């Protein structure tokens, strides 16, 4: 049997310091930014020659925080509420034999004049900060876009976005406008697990240097941000 050992060519840096809050798919939060910083041996501008002719990229990456000890053929997709099982190869579950992820992101710019350059700036990411990147390829609309494709069970169990409200105290934080909009769009996707919809519970989500604390009302379809704490001396998760 042919086997191949692969190594990361780059590391993705994002505002997602923990798994909770990461969009379930790439592109759901267009404002979620990331920077691809190459490993030293791959920091050659020639490797990116022509990449700026494209608007989107495919990123092949690894679920570095998941440790799959043995093959599990059935998984419980979040979209099915954690109650129904599907075959692992019929889902995008992170619990996979080789732990590989695939994301389509927007190419915003390439920064060549940097000590760690070239750096690729992208948006619409769904990756944890520090995620290993194994390959990068251009997105080709004529080949990669399939308008008549079927979404399978995902079409019948779509996620409904929720309305995000800010308390006055939370609005007084030092969060800039761009970050505020990004946080709103992240929370509008309702990052809570399908089995954890407790009302009046204070959730904590980290994005960038901020700890965002919120409560949710599933019946009203709202999430209310109650406090924003800047993480100066490390991150202290709300429990």
Task: State what each model feature region is.
Residues 1-45, 51-53, 141-185, 194, ...:
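Arg/Lys-rich, positively charged N-terminal/basic patches that mediate binding to nucleic acids
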Residues 17, 109-120, 219:
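Short, conserved beta-turn/loop elements at beta-strand boundaries and strand-helix junctions
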Residues 120-154:
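Flexible glycine-rich active-site/ligand-binding loops centered on an Asp-His dyad
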